[in-house]
Amino acid sequence: MRKSILPPAILALSLLATSPAEASETPQEARRCDRAIQLAREVGWLKKDLPYLRYILHRESRCQPDSIGRNRDITGKVTSEDLGYAQINDRSWVTYLKNQGIIRTRDDLLKPKTNLKAALELLRYSVRHGYDRWHQWRGTSGK
C-alpha cells in the first residue's frame, strides 16, 4: 500500500479545499459557478465567504441565474417563487429588498448581480438580527 507523501495536516487541508458543490459539479455547472463567484466578488462578497456561497449557489440553482423554484401549497397552487442564483423567496423578501433600494421589481432578482447583492444583504440581515450568517439558506445548507 502506498503512503501519502503529504504531511497529515496538509493532506487534511487539501481534502477540505474542494467544497461539496465543486465535487459534484458538471463542467458546465463549474463554469457557471466560477462566473457567479466572480460576480459575487464584484458586488462586495468577502473572499472568506466565497467557498460556502459557491456551495449555496450550486445547491440552490446549479448556478443558473434565471432559475425559478415554485413553492406550492397542498392543492398545488403556487404560493411563492424562489428566484435567481441564490433562490431568494419573493414572498418573504421582495418588500424588504425594495425598501433597501436593492431591487425595484421582483424580476430584478433574476439579474445576476442584483441577485448576488440581494443575497449579500440577506446574509447581513441575518448577522444584524443575531442569526447564523447563512440562516436564509438553512434548509439547504446544513448550517
Where are the regions a protein language model picked out?
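Catalytic and binding regions of secreted/periplasmic enzymes and modules that target cell-wall glycans
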Residues: Y52-L53, E81-K143
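Export/targeting segments at the very N-terminus of extracytoplasmic proteins
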Residues: K3-L6, I10-L15, S19-Q64
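Short, surface-exposed loop/helix-turn segments at secondary-structure junctions
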Residues: I68-I74
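Secretory-pathway/luminal and periplasmic proteins that interact with or process carbohydrate-rich
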Residues: S61-I68, S126-Y131
